[in-house]
Amino acid sequence: MQDTTLKKIIQDKSEWIRLRKEKQPLIDFKDKINKKTRDFYHSLKEKKPCFILEYKKKSPSLGIIRNNFNLIEISNVYKKYASSVSVLTDEKYFHGNLNFINIVRECVSQPVLCKDFFIDPYQVYLSRYYNADAILLMLSVLNDIQYKELSIIAKKLNMGILTEVNNIEELKRALKLNANIIGINNRNLHDLSIDLNRTRTLSSLIKKDTIIISESGIKKYREIKELSKFVNGFLIGSHLMSQTNLETAVRSIIFGDNKVCGLTRSIDIEVSEKYGAIYGGLIFVKNSPRYITKKTAKNISINRKLKLIGIFQNENINIIVDIAEELSLYGVQLHGQENKQYIDKLRNILPKKINIWKAFSIQSELPDRNWDNVNMYIFDSDSGGSNTSFNWSILNHHILDNVILAGGINLKNCITASKLKCSGLDLNSGVEISPGIKDYKKIKSIFQKLRYG
């Protein structure tokens, strides 16, 4: 949002306030305001990292972000993962509305942040009248006197305050103003560029008892893991709103793109999905202790939401295509000596919507990851499903966005594994009671660790 755009927004906001005061005078509703709010501060302090997930239909820089902007559908996803939620209420530039707050609040139990351009005391009263639990105060548009005036009213109404800063000068002001929740906006308001390093730089100047939220530009789980050491949590909006599958997008950014492999029972598919997995692995390798037939796979995967991956090893291409099509697999994972020519041939026959993943047994060095027609790579130990790991140190200093890490991942080492900058983890023997029989407690615990560890 460039300076000229921001100035225009503030000008238009002033006019909106003038007209709204005529239509809905403060005297008409001030005495009707309920001061019983949900505790915004506590929701962000309770667990780290915390997540403020945002409802945003449009922005000045991106235009329409989400065409199917259904507040109830979005809420049904957010309520499972958010610490608090944020609702854009600016009408002209973000297609928001104050009425959204009550709709959302009826659907979720979390505190609701009203995100708008607050410049007038009237707005604070109005947002609370519409049941907002917290407000955003931007130091890029408020001077210290204005900030104090608005914050005093918010506190009298028992509302939380997210104080947003964009540079070191604004941060110094926020500290002098004793802001207890500071949001660091990673977006440059001059050229709209994103710099996540701003979170690292500014957070080092903030006292430890202040809650720090990183805002804007967060898109990947590895960014969450990297920045969590500097902040308490994240406000994420545009990235999530731009995704067709919102549930998958939220899971991806909070837990990573994780797969529970070796599934043999429908209950294990349900549990894996419930606790945060995106992918489920079905093994069609006959010498595997987790082997299942096509018929069994079809029976256990009815009405599932997991993206199912079929695991094959040096299999006849026609058999792979037959199973993949009949089971509507999301992808096929090749776990043998399949070469580039084999994969090219498979790609020509396999429906385009079905992904191809290639697994490698890692020893002393990393393989080439520029194969045509491969969508994802699996880095595994010599024998998959054996609960053994390769030497993960060889992954250091590599960006591995197209790699899922496999091999011996369990409750003891999953945090270490999650910090290796892979797209996600492949969980198998480390979450089992016995081969092919998953342990629900281990699955739940490992996903909790991946989120909060």
Swiss-Prot record:
Kinase found in the keyword field: no
Region spans: Indole-3-glycerol phosphate synthase: 1-257
Coiled coil residues, start to end: none
Residue ranges, annotated region (N-(5'-phosphoribosyl)anthranilate isomerase): 258-453
Pathway where this protein functions: Amino-acid biosynthesis; L-tryptophan biosynthesis; L-tryptophan from chorismate: step 3/5; Amino-acid biosynthesis; L-tryptophan biosynthesis; L-tryptophan from chorismate: step 4/5
Keyword Manganese in annotation: no
Molecular function as annotated in GO: indole-3-glycerol-phosphate synthase activity; phosphoribosylanthranilate isomerase activity
GO BP term, pick one: L-tryptophan biosynthetic process
Domain of life: Bacteria
Assigned keywords, A-Z: Amino-acid biosynthesis, Aromatic amino acid biosynthesis, Decarboxylase, Isomerase, Lyase, Multifunctional enzyme, Tryptophan biosynthesis
Listed EC numbers: 4.1.1.48, 5.3.1.24
Reaction equation(s) it catalyzes: N-(5-phospho-beta-D-ribosyl)anthranilate = 1-(2-carboxyphenylamino)-1-deoxy-D-ribulose 5-phosphate; 1-(2-carboxyphenylamino)-1-deoxy-D-ribulose 5-phosphate + H(+) = (1S,2R)-1-C-(indol-3-yl)glycerol 3-phosphate + CO2 + H2O
Role according to the record: Bifunctional enzyme that catalyzes two sequential steps of tryptophan biosynthetic pathway. The first reaction is catalyzed by the isomerase, coded by the TrpF domain; the second reaction is catalyzed by the synthase, coded by the TrpC domain.
UniProt subunit comment: Monomer.
Similarity annotation: In the N-terminal section; belongs to the TrpC family.
PANTHER family associated with the record: INDOLE-3-GLYCEROL-PHOSPHATE SYNTHASE, TRYPTOPHAN BIOSYNTHESIS PROTEIN
Name under which the protein is recorded: Tryptophan biosynthesis protein TrpCF
Organism listed in the record: Buchnera aphidicola subsp. Acyrthosiphon pisum (strain APS) (Acyrthosiphon pisum symbiotic bacterium)
